[in-house]
Amino acid sequence: GGVGRCIYNCMNSGGGLNFIQCKTMCY
């Protein structure tokens, strides 16, 4: 779904966010 893609994009955007931060943002 879109959440997995959001997390992947978030973690690879160069913003330095970790998985937990990205998961919180993407949900």
From Swiss-Prot:
Alphabetized, the UniProt keywords read: Disulfide bond, Neurotoxin, Secreted, Toxin
Q: In which tissues is it expressed?
A: Expressed by the venom duct.
Q: Which domain of life is it from?
A: Eukaryota
For the keyword Chloroplast, the answer is no
Q: Where in the cell is it found?
A: Secreted
Domain comment quoted from the record? The cysteine framework is XIV (C-C-C-C).
Name listed for the protein in its UniProt record: Conotoxin as14a
